[in-house]
Every structure is written in structure tokens, then in C-alpha cells.
């Protein structure tokens, strides 16, 4: 049935027809089982991209991606801070730095991420440069979470089925639905998240997908300056997701009691540059990177129910940095990742 489901899906996409849930799940199952021919993978992914993916397609894809992935069972509430990537410029690793700060402020963070394509630096690239052991057993991940308050889930280790579509994605050279599915597929099942998207058009569909997938509370965000995180350079579109509703609003840096900074002040580079920026941040350096980390960490603390609003979150995040707790959290995370197992 799965092979015919993929063919059915390709034909429906070509004709502009909606796809039934069973067909969608069968199509994704074929892709991630390695049963699809390269031309079928390309036709399906390119067709969805050209037509524009829907929330239902995101939901079906995430369900099958989770089913094919390796999961880790963790008790208690977990937060993920992640973004879709796909930005046209080299950025600093805001969500990674925010995860460390949130953990230092008392949160529990299951940070899901991957490498990026050079010259950009992904969360895995910068954490490895900071000394983290990326390939962790479930026991080692849990130790990091228990001892440091944050653990890293290396996407390549948990979603090995992606190897079946990776060559075609690379050859296509365009964003595909899998750029959106990764942030929806946290291996630890984090029920809280701050999820950044690279384009405003994905804010609502990703929010609808998170709601359907059982999220307890999340913010899907797009910085209107063109970034997949809460912006310190202008307004940010937000969809707040709870089991009962999806609420749309905008926030600005001033809502968190922070100044604005030009986007150009936040440009990153190679892992060494981004690593230095994180170390400087944790050593107390003030400036644009600190402020964008503060507002994104504040959102994570708020989504997790730890603070009432963004200003309170900024204050708590700043205390975590200025007290040295965030620096110690990073050191503990790195040490634990290397000592476990």
C-alpha cells in the first residue's frame, strides 16, 4: 500500500488535489523506509515545495518521522528551543545559547539540532566546538539532562532514516518539507517549545501542526527582519499554541524591556567565531547577542510556565548569566557528555 500511496500522492500534487491522511502517511513511510526510487523522492518533495506544504502534510510527515526515529523516554516536562534554519545569512547560535541560559535558570531543555552546511554553523557544530560529545546513548543524554539541566539530541543519531532522502534533498538544492519536520520531531517528545521559522508563511501551519501533535505550550516565531527566532531588530510574529487554542500576536524588544539592535550586529560565521560569541556572552559581555539571547530565553521560560511574562523572563535569564550559573551549566554539560557511559 505504501508504494501506491507515494504514487497516488505524486499524482494528486501534480493535479493540485488535497491529500488524504492515509495517503500522506503511506508516502512518507515509503520515503523513510528507503523503498522509493530517487525520481519519486524528488517528484514528491519538489511538488510539495512548489505547491506549498499544508499543516496536514506537516502533521503526517512528523508522525511518520517520529515513528521511524529513535526516541528517548524522559519523565517530566521538557522544553526545546529550535529553528528551521534556512536563513540567507550566517547567524550566531541564538537558540543554542538560549537553551544553556534557560537550563541555568532552572528549566529542563532537550535541545534538538543538527549540523549546518558550511559556511553556516549549526547547533551541533557550535556545541562540538565548545567541547560537547555529540553522539550520546540514551543514558548519557539523561545524565546530561539530570546533572546540567540540558541535553543535546543530535538529529543525525536519532533520525537515521533521513539518509534515504538526504542525497535527493542535496541534489534538489531547495528547501523541502523536511526542513520543517525536524523541529516537529524532538526525540524526547518535548511538550514545550520555542520554534523559529525562516518565513512568515510557516508560522500558522507549524502552530497547527504542534497543536495536533500534542504540544502543551509553544511559541512559533518569525522575526520580521528575516530570522527564525525572536528578533532584537524589530517585530516578531508569534503563534502561541496550547491544547485549547492558537493565539496570534506580535512582540517587539521593548515589550521585554530591551533595546533594539541592527540585524547586521548579529552576523555569525565559522564555529570558532560562534563559539567565541557564546563564551563571551556567558562571561558577561553585554551587547546585541546578549539581548537576543535574553529575549529568546525569556520566551522559553515563559512557555515553560516559569515566569509570568517576558520582562520577568529577561530578568531571570540575566541573573543566570551574571551569576556565572550559565557558564557553569555549559561546563557541566560538556563534562557530563564526555564522562557518561
From Swiss-Prot:
| Residues the entry annotates as binding 5-phospho-alpha-D-ribose 1-diphosphate | 83, 91, 93-96, 111-115, 123
Q: Tell me the GO molecular function terms.
A: anthranilate phosphoribosyltransferase activity; magnesium ion binding
Q: So what does this one do?
A: Catalyzes the transfer of the phosphoribosyl group of 5-phosphorylribose-1-pyrophosphate (PRPP) to anthranilate to yield N-(5'-phosphoribosyl)-anthranilate (PRA).
Q: Which NCBIfam families match?
A: trpD (TIGR01245)
Q: Which domain of life is it from?
A: Bacteria
Q: Which residues bind Mg(2+) 2?
A: 228-229
Cofactor dependence is on: Mg(2+)
Any one GO cellular component localisation term in the record: cytosol
Q: Which residues does anthranilate 1 bind? A: 83, 114
Q: Indicate what this protein is called per its UniProt record.
A: Anthranilate phosphoribosyltransferase
